[in-house]
């Protein structure tokens, strides 16, 4: 039986994807039946991190090794990820939510609609305040854009008001939020977004 929602989490290396998946699992594990699929190029490091963090039982976490091109495994040939999701859905038929974390990639990465229903795209302030205006599918078309590590703005000379202006211009009415996942700032907005997609749970 398919889960009620398959939610992709994508973004560049180091933007905070795994931190977001960890935080969502901690916040939602009491309310929802959850499972996670992570993607890494040559290891299962993110899956191992989540297992060590104890956010879900290990059998609810699957690590996929994508090889050299992480975006291919979530878009052009997502069969390895579809198989991992399918295994979880077969093992846990009551799943409400499967989180699929992509390997770190560039601003052009996007998920196949065959793999996920919706996508959260994570960028971070440390990459500079110009990132939102550079565009790309993650910036302009993701279902939720998360701009993480706002605490680093003064250290890297990033202007959050510039990021806000450019994000609103690039996304129109699509939702987005600032976060500092290290200390939970803005996480409630992401949790609320996820729960809105599951109104009958």
Swiss-Prot record:
Q: Does the keyword GTP-binding apply?
A: yes
Where is it localised? Answer: Cytoplasm
Q: Which GO terms describe its biological process?
A: urea catabolic process
Q: Which domain of life is it from?
A: Bacteria
UniProt entry tagged with the keyword Phosphoprotein: no
Cite the PANTHER family for this sequence: UREASE ACCESSORY PROTEIN G
Family (UniProt): Belongs to the SIMIBI class G3E GTPase family. UreG subfamily.
Q: What is this protein called?
A: Urease accessory protein UreG
Q: Which organism is it from?
A: Synechococcus sp. (strain CC9902)
Gene name tied to this protein: ureG
